[in-house]
A protein has these predicted regions:
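A short SAM/SAH-binding and catalytic strip from SAM-dependent methyltransferases
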Residues: 100-113
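C-terminal alpha-helical "lid/dimerization" subdomain adjacent to the S-adenosyl-L-methionine
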Residues: 6, 13-19, 132-162
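A short acidic, Gly/Pro-enriched loop at the edge of an enzyme's catalytic core
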Residues: 90-102
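Conserved alpha-helix/loop element of class I SAM-dependent methyltransferases that forms part
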Residues: 16-36, 46
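Class I SAM-dependent methyltransferase SAM/SAH-binding core
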Residues: 38-40, 44-91
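N-terminal, positively charged/glycine-rich alpha-helical extensions of SAM-dependent methyltransferases
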Residues: 1-10, 21-23
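A short glycine-rich, Lys/Arg-flanked "PGG" loop and its adjoining helix->strand segment in the class I
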Residues: 115-127
Length: 162
């Protein structure tokens, strides 16, 4: 893992993703989580303050140890017991059908093999379980979409693969 990926990117992403508008979206996405919960791409722990009060345990995964280091304070402040795995989303060390809810917020874009990660999430989700997610994508507006395509090579460098 590069110095940028481990030390600089986590702080940059934490700053960019901690806006008030993002917090509102996080709260909405997490409002209905119950039971055994798995969060893929926990990042710097920005979701932690938005979990409902009844959540007492959470299992998380993120391949970036620098992100996980920044998440420690938010995890401690949340009072939620966390079991964390420093792994990518394509091969999760969890038993089949072991979670009632899976949380994924602005994460899929950073996973090299999205299809495999989605298969893994489905594998660990119990029958009738729910995926709570939010993701960004291409704009509806053609002009904006063109700019998104032009800026993608730069974005992938600055955002560590996103």
């Amino acid at each position: 893992m590069s110095i940028y990926s481990r030390y600089i990117f986590p702080r940059l992403m934490d700053f960019v993703m901690s806006s008030g508008q993002m917090s509102k979206v996080r709260a909405a996405v997490l409002s209905g989580v119950t039971g055994e919960i798995f969060e893929i791409g926990v990042g710097t722990g920005l979701n932690m303050p938005h979990y409902p009060k009844h959540v007492t345990h959470l299992t998380t995964a993120d391949p970036n140890a620098g992100m996980s280091k920044l998440a420690r304070n938010r995890i401690a402040e949340s009072g939620i017991q966390v079991t964390h795995y420093t792994v990518g989303g394509e091969s999760l060390p969890c038993k089949d059908e072991s979670f009632d809810c899976v949380v994924c917020t602005w994460t899929l874009c950073s996973i090299p093999n999205v299809e495999q990660a989605l298969r893994e999430l489905r594998r660990i989700l119990r029958p009738g379980g729910k995926l709570h997610f939010v993701e960004h994508g291409l704009a509806d507006d053609e002009g904006v979409r063109r700019w998104q395509h032009r800026l993608t090579p730069i974005q992938k460098i600055v955002s560590d693969g996103c």
